[in-house]
Design a protein with these regions (language model features):
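Short, basic/aromatic recognition patches
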Residues: 11-30
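Acidic Asp/Glu-based divalent-cation binding sites
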Residues: 8, 27, 44-45
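Conserved catalytic-core subdomain
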Residues: 37, 42-134
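Short, well-structured alpha-helical patches and their helix-loop capping segments
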Residues: 9-12, 63
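Single conserved hydrophobic/aromatic residue that forms the stacking wall/gate
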Residues: 1-8
């Protein structure tokens, strides 16, 4: 449980990511001290519900992230507090960072996300926008 301290807690993030990989988990998800979903160890988190992109607000304690900023400047994004028990409400989930770009998520804990269409579409649009810069 961290809130706004990722820059000071990089060793913790790396350690948690390694521990998660040992358990077959690609990216651990961190909750803040209020139990709200904040971010992944090295990623920002987004959800889709009824074709609306939803993200935890920065006040949840995550770092903004380059791809997160790109998405905010390109698409309408609704910010809301997200609790672990809210997972069943969402159609899709995806993670972002500057190395991965956009990575659709098919499962988080016991929750599965049946669709990855929007995440894949955003990934393709990001790829196309970067290709046009070359």
């Amino acid at each position: 449980n961290v809130t706004g301290v990722q820059t000071c807690a990089l060793p913790i993030c790396i350690m948690e990511k390694r521990h998660a990989k040992e358990m077959g988990i690609q990216e651990p998800v961190f909750l803040n001290t209020k139990g709200e979903i904040a971010e992944g160890a090295t990623t920002n988190i987004f959800f889709i519900k009824d074709n609306q992109i939803i993200a935890p607000p920065l006040s949840c304690g995550m770092l903004p992230g380059i791809i997160r900023e790109y998405l905010y400047s390109t698409y309408p994004i609704k910010e809301q507090i997200i609790l672990p028990e809210d997972m069943g409400e969402f159609d899709e989930m995806f993670l972002t960072n500057s190395l991965l770009g956009i990575m659709p998520v098919c499962k988080l804990g016991s929750y599965t996300f049946p669709s990855m269409n929007t995440g894949r579409k955003l990934l393709q649009e990001l790829y196309n926008s970067q290709r046009s810069l070359c």
